């Protein structure tokens, strides 16, 4: 962050009650680098509280928030600030996380997944004016917008999804900035990946439950496509679960004919769905190839095995 190529900025590092030597290291760095300020919290309060603490002590109108283990591209702030300063209706911007650890199959699969989820879907969502969520690992905010919505909430498991909905329900825009790069580490074990995805799913359900009553007014019409997309995804997941339950149940007991699942192998419609998925991955990787050392064909080989 201290290497960012922007003329005027400060770096605020929030130590969220760490029990290791993080506090000592940050204090030493603060003495070494003039532009670094450190905020120490007495005990771990969660990311939302840490973000609020950093925002409260900041002296500028614009905030660029990254995770402690993320590596910010030197030009990322420049690209994000362009959108925040040039468009007065923009309350937040979200960057483009790129995965560093690709030694395992899970790591390679997530490269394609991130290009699809973070890249292509956010580009598509912008066509109808709203984005489901900023990327928690790299996001920029206008402090005025944050103050209007009461900053980040402590009672939501995914503060990034929550703040995105709060800001957009107050009619602020969120822009996706693909050139604002940030390099991150992702889970490379099934257990770590499972916990992460359960957390993301729970976060989506929480915001849908919390803000559904606010959707029934004219100023929230642009949020309906995002809410509908989220709801359809949930229904899809439960249908897939039901298919598996009915299939395995049918192995032991008689299931009514109209409910019987004879095979888990995809039929012709499953093949069409798989081809559509592969086309989506190809397009997303092709668009993002400029940010990934032109290795999109190598990455595409691995997404073929995406479940």
Regions found by a protein language model. Name each.
Residues 157-163:
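Acidic donor-binding loop at a coil-to-helix junction in glycosyltransferase catalytic cores
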Residues 164-182:
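Catalytic donor-sugar/metal-binding loop of nucleotide-sugar-dependent glycosyltransferases
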Residues 15-24, 43:
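A conserved acidic beta->alpha catalytic loop
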Residues 1-8:
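Short, acidic, metal-binding catalytic loop of nucleotide-sugar glycosyltransferases
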Residues 232-307:
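Membrane-embedded multi-pass helical conduit in multi-pass membrane proteins
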Residues 20-28, 51, 75:
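Acidic helix N-cap motif at the loop->helix transition within catalytic regions
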Residues 33-40, 48-50, 56, 60-61, ...:
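Long helical/loop segments within the catalytic core of UDP-sugar-dependent glycosyltransferases
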């Amino acid at each position: 962050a201290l290497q960012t190529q922007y003329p005027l900025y400060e770096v605020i590092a929030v130590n969220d009650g760490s029990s290791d030597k993080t506090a000592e290291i940050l204090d030493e760095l603060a003495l070494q680098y003039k532009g670094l300020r450190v905020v120490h919290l007495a005990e771990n309060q969660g990311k939302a509280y840490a973000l609020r603490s950093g925002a409260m002590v900041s002296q500028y109108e614009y905030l660029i928030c990254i995770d402690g283990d993320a590596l910010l591209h030197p030009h990322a702030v420049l690209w994000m600030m362009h959108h925040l300063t040039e468009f007065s209706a923009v309350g937040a911007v979200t960057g483009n996380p790129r995965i560093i650890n690709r030694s395992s199959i899970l790591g390679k699969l997530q490269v394609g997944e991130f290009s699809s989820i973070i890249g292509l879907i956010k580009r598509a969502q912008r066509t109808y004016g709203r984005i489901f969520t900023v990327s928690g690992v790299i996001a920029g905010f206008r402090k005025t917008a944050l103050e209007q919505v009461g900053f980040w909430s402590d009672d939501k498991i995914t503060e990034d999804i929550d703040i995105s909905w709060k800001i957009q329900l107050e009619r602020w825009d969120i822009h996706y900035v693909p050139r604002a790069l940030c390099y991150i580490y992702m889970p490379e074990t099934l257990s770590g990946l499972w916990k992460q995805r359960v957390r993301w799913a729970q976060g989506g359900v929480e915001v849908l439950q919390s803000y559904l009553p606010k959707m029934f007014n004219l100023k929230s019409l642009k949020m309906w496509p995002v809410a509908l997309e989220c709801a359809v995804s949930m229904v899809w997941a439960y249908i897939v679960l039901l298919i598996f339950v009915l299939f395995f149940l049918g192995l032991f007991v008689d299931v009514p004919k109209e409910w019987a699942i004879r095979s888990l192998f995809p039929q012709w419609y499953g093949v069409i769905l798989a081809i559509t998925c592969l086309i989506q991955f190809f397009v997303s990787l092709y668009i993002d190839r400029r940010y990934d050392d032109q290795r999109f064909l190598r990455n595409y080989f691995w997404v073929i095995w995406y479940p």
